Amino acid sequence: DTTAIIKDNKRIGTAVIARFDFNTQKDEQILVNTAISGVSMEGAAKNLQAEVPENDFDKYLAETKANWNRQLGKIEIKSDNENDKVNFYTALYHSMIAPTIYSDVDGAYYGPDKKVHQANGWVNYSTFSLWDTYRAAHPLFTYTEPERVNDMVKSFIAFYEQNGRLPVWNFYGSETDMMIGYHAVPVIVDAYLKGIGDFDAKKALDACIATANLDNYRGIGLYKELGYIPYNVTDHYKAENW
């Protein structure tokens, strides 16, 4: 459905796009600075001013290249096989695509309760595909991105406080419920056991226990009553419950 609905002077709908036409000459290049916010147009403007204050494409291209080289340079491998290097650093790059920052430069973010919240002194993250990532990607982050792991756990705790459950598959501040298990738990435990960050361990533990005891979540009530449910689900819950 690509039909936009106008409500409160805003266009809403599925697959709605914005189109801009510029009166350019042949081979003319134009420079357009854009920014986004999960909160407001004002937030997007603040993000743009903070992150791209100058109209200098080449400067930001050079900074972006330097940032990626610094990120990928956190792990150095030695090999005479160029294909091995390409495969390794491509995989390392892929590991850095998500999670994504979901708070504005002023700390404001849109929570799962559809309210605007404030992250003071930390960065709110989203895009947690936890069934896919708790086994390898998140343990990797504890070595390559420990300061981000701290903020990720704080994001989990905030999500629990606003949603009543730790995230399962958090995407842009909302719960998609596309996966089984509640794999935020092993991510939290791994960070705690490695002594990472200053997140509130008591709040984190309370969130883990409360999530594990939600009878109405995907068979947990039967799991608690019988000690088992279909084996493929039990296999995933064991990672959280042991």
In which residue ranges do the predicted regions lie?
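Aromatic-rich carbohydrate-recognition surfaces in CAZymes
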Residues: 126-242
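Acidic/polar, glycine-enriched structural segments that form the non-catalytic walls/loops
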Residues: 1-124, 158, 165-168, 198, ...
